[in-house]
């Protein structure tokens, strides 16, 4: 039977309680620390920043504080990962170098930076500049240069294209940076095996958890915001059809 463990609170505190070398795969989408960056720009994105970016908690932190928090995250991530375990971290392209440097300090081997392309992005400011249709992700393994990689003989590109999150995946509520299940399921299937344990310390509305449970993986999720935690819990319960 697949086990799920969900926590509403600070991931830096809850991760300390996770046993060492107990996690096979981490997939997570931490705050991008774009809040203050957007606030200081003289554009009409300030309202979007107030409504969306600011809701992400760490996103409004001073850069040095955000970097310090991410360093603590990688310290715990490397501790809980099994040797040969993998981690996928979504991040703004302008922060990729910082994330790689922090991760490598904690024994994580940098494998790849890839792109998620949204095939139907919001056409916001389409007459002013190029529409924002991509986000980056980074792939690391712990203590080894290789890990689980279920490509089944296929060539898997580092450019992944899906539509944005559908309304059916938002029926319990919306999250401003919600990733589609199809995207998360891709990483779940390729980088883990059935009965492995997957962790998402920045769970949001639970797309990683839903994908993990659907594919017979154990799941540990942590989310600071109570509203998003409740959305994630409802989504995962629906898939699991069991009491968490």
Regions found by a protein language model. Name each.
Residues 1-122, 128, 152-244:
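S-adenosyl-L-methionine-dependent nucleic acid methyltransferase catalytic domains
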Residues 82, 130, 136-147:
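Core SAM-dependent methyltransferase catalytic element
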């Amino acid at each position: 039977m697949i086990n799920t463990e969900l926590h509403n609170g600070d991931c830096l505190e809850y991760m300390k309680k996770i046993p060492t070398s107990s996690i096979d795969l981490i997939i997570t989408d931490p705050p991008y620390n774009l809040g203050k960056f957007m606030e200081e720009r003289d554009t009409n994105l300030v309202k979007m920043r107030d409504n969306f970016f600011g809701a992400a908690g760490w996103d409004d932190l001073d850069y040095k504080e955000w970097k310090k928090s991410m360093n603590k995250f990688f310290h715990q991530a490397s501790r809980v990962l099994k040797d040969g375990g993998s981690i996928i971290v979504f991040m703004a392209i302008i922060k990729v170098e910082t994330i790689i440097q922090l991760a490598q300090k904690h024994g994580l081997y940098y494998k790849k930076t890839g792109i998620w392309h949204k095939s139907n992005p919001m056409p916001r400011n389409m007459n002013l500049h190029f529409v924002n249709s991509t986000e980056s992700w980074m792939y690391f393994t712990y203590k080894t240069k290789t890990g689980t990689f279920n490509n089944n003989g296929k060539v898997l590109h580092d450019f992944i294209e899906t539509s944005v999150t559908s309304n059916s995946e938002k029926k319990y509520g919306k999250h401003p940076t919600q990733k589609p299940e199809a995207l998360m399921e891709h990483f779940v299937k390729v980088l883990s095996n059935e009965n492995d344990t997957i962790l998402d310390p920045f769970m949001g509305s639970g797309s990683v958890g839903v994908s993990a449970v659907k594919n017979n993986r154990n799941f540990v999720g942590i989310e600071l915001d109570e509203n998003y935690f409740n959305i994630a819990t409802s989504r995962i319960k629906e898939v699991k059809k069991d009491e968490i």
